[in-house]
Amino acid sequence: MGLAWGLGVLLLLHACGSNRIPESGGDNSVFDIFELTGAARKRSGRRLVKGPDPSSPAFRIEDANLIPPVPDKKFQDLVDAVRAEKGFLLLASLRQMKKTRGTLLAVERKDHSGQVFSVISNGKAGTLDLSLTVQGKQHVVSVEEALLATGQWKSITLFVQEDRAQLYIDCEKMENAELDVPIQSIFTRDLASIARLRIAKGGVNDNFQGVLQNVRFVFGTTPEDILRNKGCSSSTSVFVTLDNNVVNGSSPAIRTDYIGHKTKDLQAICGISCDELSSMVLELRGLRTIVTTLQDSIRKVTEENKELANELRRPPLCYHNGVQYRTGDEWTVDSCTECRCQNSVTICKKVSCPIMPCSNATVPDGECCPRCWPSDSADDGWSPWSEWTSCSVTCGNGIQQRGRSCDSLNNRCEGSSVQTRTCHIQECDKRFKQDGGWSHWSPWSSCSVTCGDGVITRIRLCNSPSPQMNGKPCEGKARETKACQKDSCPINGGWGPWSPWDICSVTCGGGVQKRSRLCNNPKPQFGGKDCVGDVTENQICNKQDCPIDGCLSNPCFAGVQCTSYPDGSWKCGACPPGYSGDGVECKDVDECKEVPDACFNHNGEHRCENTDPGYNCLPCPPRFTGSQPFGRGVEHATANKQVCKPRNPCTDGTHDCNKNAKCNYLGHYSDPMYRCECKPGYAGNGIICGEDTDLDGWPNEDLLCVANATYHCRKDNCPNLPNSGQEDYDKDGIGDACDDDDDNDKIPDDRDNCPFHYNPAQYDYDRDDVGDRCDNCPYNHNPDQADTDNNGEGDACAADIDGDSILNERDNCQYVYNVDQKDTDMDGVGDQCDNCPLEHNPDQLDSDSDRIGDTCDNNQDIDEDGHQNNLDNCPYVPNANQADHDKDGKGDACDHDDDNDGIPDDRDNCRLVPNPDQKDSDGDGRGDACKDDFDQDKVPDIDDICPENVDISETDFRRFQMIPLDPKGTSQNDPNWVVRHQGKELVQTVNCDPGLAVGYDEFNAVDFSGTFFINTERDDDYAGFVFGYQSSSRFYVVMWKQVTQSYWDTNPTRAQGYSGLSVKVVNSTTGPGEHLRNALWHTGNTSGQVRTLWHDPRHIGWKDFTAYRWHLSHRPKTGFIRVVMYEGKKIMADSGPIYDKTYAGGRLGLFVFSQEMVFFSDLKYECRDS
């Protein structure tokens, strides 16, 4: 039995030893990360705690930044092991805080530029993420349903072999994951020199939160052995090979050469050869000797254990100062220390003494505590007297007492222990409660005056009886008063004020003047005395001698005041207004010259006429309104300057627009000066407006407009579906947009391969769903029907796509007309279509869709107008439209002479058209050279949407750039845009990923309007438009959601879209992709992606089959933004003024996100730079 037991123990030890994971030591098969980073260090960012494995330390991560990295030499060994076995096994036990995201291991660059490789437990998404940096770009591979952040202990086994990864959580096998590159290409030979291995440390918010134990890299074993050692059953740990073969003789981290049982090969069934069996017999003979020796050793240990047990059975003893005591014995060491034996332990303690009540206590010899002794004094033994008690009564006579105590054991204590004395605090009050009562009234007093009106008074007292002991006071008045009257008092008279002196009787030589007064202040009454003194008073006046009058000869200028003096001299006053001089002689003042802006200056002419005297202004020029001042003198001319303002019929009420139309002022140089435009919900020519249900600019019924003015007065051929182009191929009065069979070939449009060509046979040779009758390449598959040169021959079959007479195979710009074939940078792409014409870039890559190739795109744009500094014709002045009418390389925004005719812009009457003679035949301030067409683009100003930009004259989205905002997404298609109405109407037909259709016209200040219509009941997502577009990462967007909804994919961020209209500014650090996609869906701010400027607080979503009309105003110079959305005739939503200066202008376009059948109709944009 003993032999069998010993052999079993040895075999068990042998088996466990062969399967045990070796500790890190001299070999490189196991790398314990905590051991390598110095687990025993203090203040190392971790704290030792208990884990599920009692034989290994576990650490709570407190500050991962303080945990040192793995030493470079050990990290190099680890890298060499990974490269040798083309993979690794990573083991770890962890207890991660709930719903947190934390990094288990990370290989970070020493220059802090980022991570090369990391293993992250993403508790928010329930995944284990492997992050790899490949060619400077981060790739993330996730193992789904890896629920590790639960607050419970979890054990993971991660096996990575080349480009495959397999995860086990506890004993449960997760799904395989595939890496973008083999792991050995990440763990390069020089990795340890440029990077370091960190535990628990990730990005800014990705440090691990929780407890870690046994974090190890293991090599030279298999996942089966690892799982078996963990106690996992074979059924749960069956390993499926990852289809990796041994390369160049290296062994993989997990052996993949397992072969299943065979039933006919005996040796294969046994698994051991005969030679191996012979070897095992020899080993077992040697083991027999070892087992015998082991039996002897165990027998000896058993005997020693018995002797030790006998010793333990003896009763316990105590030893103190060499003396032996049994349990329970007590003894005294000295007079103050007592000891006792208790379970082999000696316990000693000091004797505690009581407090003595006497003052003469002493300690007798041989004792530890003091004692009191008898005394001969009678007072000895008494304590001091206590304080007297309170008096026994509060009034009258009472008593007080005090006491003392006696130590009768040690003293005689003669005398009393209590003393008593009398006390008297105050006399007791013998009164009783009594209410007060009035006495009788006193007689009335005599009158207070001897004459006139006075008063008499009487009084009474509250003393019959007086109130006491809180009795009630008397009620009523203690004093009464009433009037008394005597004879009236006499009033003495008083003088009133003197009157003014009257006129002197003569003007010179001495005369008399007098004044008077009345006795009425007051008049004497009731026997009063009259006033004392005279009623009148006289005095002498004008005593001076009479002079000689020098002004009698009229020496001054007509109208000038003359002043004479007694000596016969005289003096003239100032000249009249409009004259200058000394008063004797006065000359006319030229007010037009003295005040050069007294009248309106027009075309360099001061419209002022001088008269004698005075001046007058000429009437305001044609198309101006204002006053016509006239008068005399410089002061009058300065204070009353003529102001002539351009006439505006829209504000002065002289227009003839319909009451349901808006008057748009075009400027006083235009003829006419205004244009009438029907308001949303109405259509017509502006003079006459009728109802327009679908808001496409065409009335529901025919309107009786003036002769030859039928534009937008004709009845809408699809009154309930926007179709601003009114296309009607078969001329049946039903527009193509709502006609089920446009070509009347009895084939419905949704199944007709030529909906606008009669072809009942539906022949389609090239199977591109475009019938041969309408296919511009009937023998070449081209469903897009692209035709760059518009010659009727599709690009797919054209030998010269762009029509420049150069065959495609020799054309360096196949889609752009360029006869010269100039190619400055010799990259095979002609300058006309090269997005970096001066730098070699044959791939033409443009990651941010700003039409500048990545090779030359530096994104440095100091004025934020969408044009980088080295390509901006005004790098320091925002001018998104880059207008340069004289083509001198300097944009109009920073050019003081836009037409280069030598006349500065501020004085040029044709700023954009050269006219050095400045001829202006009608004198209206607009030169003849640009009369009625300011930019000379052959479009009259009244019809020109941008009269000051020769490059833009009408709204046109026929050419647009399609921008995918989630180019890697495969859950939906890219948008499909259908162009109608010469680019003024676009329809997006499919449920798609987020995308834009951006026109090529660029704008500074702009107004943008259009009709929005969803022609389906399917889906409820986003549609809208963009403005200020500069790249796929930088633009403004107005987007509208029908219902509140969370985006289905919560990676990389959770996105909640609320119903209602939103205005957002996109400034993405990542550009198109899943980050921007989720940020656009989310109603709110997403750091580094999107900021919401405004969201409709009423959360009104769009309705199916309902027409809406939007109007956008954007003024980049001030940052002003306003969006108004109409439903029919009424405003449904209004953002009000929003101010944001992120972008100084850009391009316009349309936006969709997961919404099909979106109609954008009757699109209009207008420049607002003036």
Swiss-Prot record:
Matches recorded under SMART domains: EGF, EGF_CA, TSP1, TSPN, VWC
Glycan attachment residues as annotated in the record: 248, 360, 553, 708, 1067, 1085
Q: Indicate the segments forming the Laminin G-like domain, all copies.
A: 65-270
Q: Where is this region: Heparin-binding?
A: 47-95
Q: Hey, what's the signal peptide range on this chain?
A: 1-18
Entry keyword annotation includes Endoplasmic reticulum? yes
Q: Which pairs are disulfide-linked? A: 171-232, 391-423, 395-428, 406-413, 447-484, 451-489, 462-474, 504-541, 508-546, 519-531, 551-562, 556-572, 575-586, 592-608, 599-617, 620-644, 650-663, 657-676, 678-689, 705-713, 718-738, 754-774, 777-797, 813-833, 836-856, 874-894, 910-930, 946-1167
For region Disordered, the annotated ranges are 839-944
Any single GO molecular-function term of the entry would be:
calcium ion binding
Instruction: Give the TSP type-1 domain ranges.
Output: 379-429, 435-490, 492-547
Show the ranges annotated as biased composition (Basic and acidic residues): 840-854, 883-894, 917-941
Protein keywords: Calcium, Cell adhesion, Disulfide bond, EGF-like domain, Endoplasmic reticulum, Extracellular matrix, Glycoprotein, Heparin-binding, Repeat, Sarcoplasmic reticulum, Secreted, Signal, Unfolded protein response
Motif Cell attachment site mapped to chain: 926-928
One GO biological process term is: response to unfolded protein
Q: In this protein, which residues make up the domain named VWFC?
A: 316-373
Under the heading InterPro entries, the entry gives: ConA-like_dom_sf, EGF-like_Ca-bd_dom, EGF-like_dom, Thrombospondin_3-like_rpt, Thrombospondin_3_rpt, Thrombospondin_C, TSP1_rpt, TSP1_rpt_sf
Function summary: Adhesive glycoprotein that mediates cell-to-cell and cell-to-matrix interactions. Multifunctional, involved in inflammation, angiogenesis, wound healing, reactive oxygen species (ROS) signaling, nitrous oxide (NO) signaling, apoptosis, senescence, aging, cellular self-renewal, stemness, and cardiovascular and metabolic homeostasis. Negatively modulates dendritic cell activation and cytokine release, as part of an autocrine feedback loop, contributing to the resolution of inflammation and immune homeostasis. Ligand for receptor CD47.
**Assembly behavior:** Homotrimer; disulfide-linked. Can bind to fibrinogen, fibronectin, laminin, type V collagen and integrins alpha-V/beta-1, alpha-V/beta-3 and alpha-IIb/beta-3. Binds heparin. Interacts (via the C-terminal domain) with CD47. Interacts (via the TSP type I repeats) with CD36; the interaction conveys an antiangiogenic effect. Interacts (via the TSP type I repeats) with HRG; the interaction blocks the antiangiogenic effect of THBS1 with CD36. Interacts with ATF6 (via lumenal domain).
Q: What's the protein called, per UniProt?
A: Thrombospondin-1
Q: Whose protein is this, by species?
A: Bos taurus
Species classification:
Eukaryota, Metazoa, Chordata, Craniata, Vertebrata
Q: Which gene encodes it?
A: THBS1
